[in-house]
């Protein structure tokens, strides 16, 4: 993993423990005397902030492990206790704060990924597998304790000095932080910067003698000097960016305003209420980078002004109206937090006027002002149904180069974080037609697709679709529905079309209509048009002459590119990838040229019928959109290598 990919993944891992803070803040706030006056509720919220480093250790360990494992989370806690308790025996002054939790969480996650399946000798077998993970993590963290016991004190001094410099720099320091914070948003590295500012810099000791580090911790612990890294975000997120949204709406041609109005309104309301601004920011970041640079400068100015005015405000989640109301009467909030609203109104007009002028002056392609080809949004991109989500996930896989190019899938609140074989194969236009705000290509293997609040659900569905079978790359510039191939045309409708490919059945068995396949991706023809067969024999053959371009590692599916350019996917059974190759044996290797009827796979059909979810096997043309029609020829029983299955008609 390259360094940029590491920090991108770390940013995602930090999302889980950070997600706990809004709940803690609500409990802490509502338990205060001026609201519910229920101390045990306030203490419940305070407990989260008091043990934040431990929560980071558990959350990061779970997120970093390859399957969000509970044993990794336990190992994170074990590692944290071992390292922190051992370090202070070397130097009692050591305090790593949440960094200790992050480091031990990373160690625990890495140990799980490497040794969760370890086999030990019989007399130690009880400690093998996942039980080995907390033990090994504790050992490694003990070594880290010995190292950090001597290495960390100068680092701690440097952090303390750096924090003091930024704090002593006052308004200038907070302004620099705000500017850099926005510039790092496209890479996702802002989460790392935020963690240092919000959970590490600064120190406050309460009446009970408990020490708190970081702007957020100190603010909710009652430190009246906290908030310099938070206050200035409120005018930007609640007012400035909605002003930018209005400017982009009015800059769009009147005929296109209805198309972009709903989208801009929804992201503006989200920014105002919750402070989640990335969906709005990414609308103009990629289309008009100059505007984003202007936005970063204005954010720095806002933090500068807020600090210069002595405003101390804080948030548990982000600088939206909800957090503003919750923190307004907190002990740490300054008496002049109302000035943030005045600043907000000013920034609303500043953003509106500057964005309006710059968009028109440089003819920037903000939403609604793009070329006509960019206006097309596929139907499934607006679907909230389960089927629509599956189609959308399949389409994104195709847009990033298909399963051949997609190597790893992660997601955070607003973006898909993907590792690909070659970012040059990613179809930016196809992603935008699906509703993505933009695509960030961090390097040749690391990309981010900005999809908004549904990122995690889309990412999870993408993982499911990938396990079901291969998805071909999207065409270079498709002109309509990217994911769903047109239904097969009736024979009489294509009577004059030339047959470019004739396929024989690759399997002996019974024909099943594609719509009856117990898998939405195939049944909806998102993967391609074709037919399915329920096998009654063990041998799978090539349905046409061509090249076997891909055989999955588990040998349950293969892709054949015919001599005439048709891309045929033969997928044996549904969810058979979960069998990890059991029941399948490949008879040829990738890159082999084959003739129609030549054996490709051998199956243990008895085993598969007993263990697979279904052995109904789709045979689809993944690039069926390149042809005018697909004419089904087979029905009833078919014989592998002999019975004609379907014909593909040219345009």
Curated annotation (Swiss-Prot):
Keyword Kinase: yes
EC number: 2.7.1.193
Listed transmembrane segments: 16-36, 40-60, 70-90, 92-112, 132-152, 165-185, 192-212, 232-252, 264-284, 285-305, 308-328, 339-359
Entry-annotated residues carrying Phosphocysteine: 412
Domain PTS EIIA type-1 residue range list: 519-623
Topological relation to the membrane, as annotated: Multi-pass membrane protein
Cysteine-cysteine disulfides: none
Record's catalysed reaction(s): N(pros)-phospho-L-histidyl-[protein] + N-acetyl-D-glucosamine(out) = N-acetyl-D-glucosamine 6-phosphate(in) + L-histidyl-[protein]
Domain PTS EIIB type-1: 390-472
Subcellular locations according to the entry: Cell inner membrane
Recorded domain comment: The PTS EIIC type-1 domain forms the PTS system translocation channel and contains the specific substrate-binding site.
Record protein name field: PTS system N-acetylglucosamine-specific EIICBA component
UniProt source species: Klebsiella pneumoniae
């Amino acid at each position: 993993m390259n360094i940029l990919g590491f920090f991108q993944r770390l940013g995602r891992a930090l999302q889980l423990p950070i997600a706990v803070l809004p709940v803690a803040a609500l409990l802490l706030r509502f338990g205060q005397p001026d609201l519910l006056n229920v101390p045990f509720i306030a203490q419940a919220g305070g407990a989260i902030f008091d043990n934040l480093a431990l929560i980071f250790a558990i959350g990061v360990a779970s997120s970093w492990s390859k399957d969000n494992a509970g044993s990794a989370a336990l190992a994170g806690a074990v590692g944290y206790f071992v390292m922190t308790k051992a370090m202070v025996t070397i130097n009692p002054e050591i305090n790593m704060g949440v960094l200790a939790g992050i480091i031990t969480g990373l160690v625990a996650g890495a140990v799980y990924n490497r040794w969760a399946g370890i086999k030990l000798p019989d007399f130690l077998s009880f400690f093998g597998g996942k039980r080995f993970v907390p033990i090994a993590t504790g050992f490694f963290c003990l070594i880290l304790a010995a190292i950090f016991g001597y290495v960390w004190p100068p680092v701690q001094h440097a952090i303390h000095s750096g924090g003091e410099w930024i704090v002593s720099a006052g308004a200038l320091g907070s302004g620099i932080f705000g500017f850099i914070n926005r510039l790092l948003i496209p890479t996702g590295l802002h989460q790392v910067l935020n963690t240092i500012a919000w959970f590490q810099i600064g120190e406050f000791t309460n009446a009970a003698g408990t020490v708190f580090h970081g702007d957020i911790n100190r603010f909710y612990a009652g430190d009246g000097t906290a908030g310099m890294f938070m206050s200035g975000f409120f005018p930007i997120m609640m007012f400035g960016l909605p002003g930018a949204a209005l400017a982009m709406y009015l800059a769009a041609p009147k005929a296109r305003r209805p198309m972009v109005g709903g989208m801009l309104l929804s992201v503006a309301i989200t920014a105002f209420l919750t402070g989640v601004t990335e969906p709005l920011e990414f609308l103009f970041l990629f289309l008009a980078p100059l505007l984003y640079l202007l936005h970063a400068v204005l954010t720095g100015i806002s933090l500068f002004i807020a600090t210069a005015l002595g405003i101390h405000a804080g948030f548990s989640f982000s600088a939206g109206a909800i957090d503003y109301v919750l923190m307004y009467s907190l002990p740490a909030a300054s008496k002049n937090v109302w000035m943030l609203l005045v600043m907000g109104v000013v920034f609303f007009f500043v953003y509106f006027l500057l964005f309006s002028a710059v968009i028109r002056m440089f003819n920037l392609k903000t939403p609604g002002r793009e070329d006509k080809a960019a206006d097309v949004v596929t139907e499934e991109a607006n679907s909230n149904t389960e089927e629509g989500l599956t189609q959308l996930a399949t389409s994104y896989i195709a847009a990033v180069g298909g399963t051949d190019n997609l190597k790893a899938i992660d997601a955070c609140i607003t973006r898909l974080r993907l590792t690909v074989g070659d970012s040059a194969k990613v179809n930016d236009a196809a992603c935008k037609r699906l509703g993505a705000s933009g695509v960030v290509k961090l390097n040749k293997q690391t990309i981010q697709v900005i999809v908004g609040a549904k990122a995690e659900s889309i990412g999870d569905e993408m993982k499911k679709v990938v396990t079901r079978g291969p998805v071909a790359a999207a065409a270079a510039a498709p002109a309509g529905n990217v994911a769903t191939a047109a239904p097969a045309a009736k024979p009489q409708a294509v009577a004059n079309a030339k047959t470019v490919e004739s396929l024989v059945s690759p399997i002996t068995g019974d024909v099943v209509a594609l719509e009856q396949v117990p898998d939405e991706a195939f049944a909806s023809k998102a993967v391609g048009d074709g037919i399915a067969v329920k096998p009654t024999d063990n041998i799978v053959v090539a349905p046409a002459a061509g090249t076997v371009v891909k055989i999955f590692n588990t040998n349950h599916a293969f892709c054949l590119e015919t001599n005439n350019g048709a891309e045929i996917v033969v997928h044996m059974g549904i969810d058979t990838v979960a069998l990890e190759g059991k029941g399948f044996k490949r008879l040829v290797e990738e890159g082999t040229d084959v003739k129609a009827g030549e054996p490709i796979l051998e199956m243990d059909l008895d085993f598969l019928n007993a263990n697979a979810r279904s052995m109904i096997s789709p045979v689809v043309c993944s690039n069926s959109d390149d042809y005018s029609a697909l004419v089904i020829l087979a029905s009833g029983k078919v014989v592998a290598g002999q019975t004609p299955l379907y014909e593909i008609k040219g345009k």
